[in-house]
């Protein structure tokens, strides 16, 4: 907590109920289109991120499917404040050759402002996969004054913005799930996983 003087509940609406809600929404959307998939899509909500990526590390050591069959990891962490910052940050866009041009086209078609970051490192669960040379994308709407405080409540979540981000992520995941080719990793590594 960044408010250690209080015993108030920290609901974590943006960090990271927004990401969990995004996963559930994407699961519903992708389920309706699953007959077109070439690959399985795993929806995973990890725990222990704040304590050192414990959940994603455990998964990578005990995967449901072999990690060499995992073609990408897409992470939604703090995606509930699009209206606050006016853009979604996407990390890992250069971890596979296809990511940057595809996401640019998708964002343009949806009129979503983006800020791209090439690296796949960072303090969230995607980093665990990137360390294992799996291409990653991490969607994030930025830090704010409610981060890790009791004031991170639902009334501050931009639900329309979260829906737009889900539109963008859906296009990216759908391309990964239906493209016959695996993404081509561009840099070695030092929740949503796609298998195929």
Name the predicted role of every residue range.
Residues 46-144, 158, 162:
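Metal-dependent peptidase/peptidase-like ectodomains
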Residues 1-53, 169:
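Alpha-helical metal-binding/catalytic segments enriched in His/Glu/Asp
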Residues 3-12, 85-88, 150, 154:
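Glycine- and acidic
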Residues 22, 102, 164, 168:
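Charged catalytic carboxylate motif
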Residues 25-35, 61-65, 104-112, 170-181:
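Sec-exported extracytoplasmic/periplasmic mature domains
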Residues 179-196:
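PDZ/PDZ-like peptide-tail recognition elements
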Residues 133-182:
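Extended, hydrophobic interaction surfaces within ordered domains
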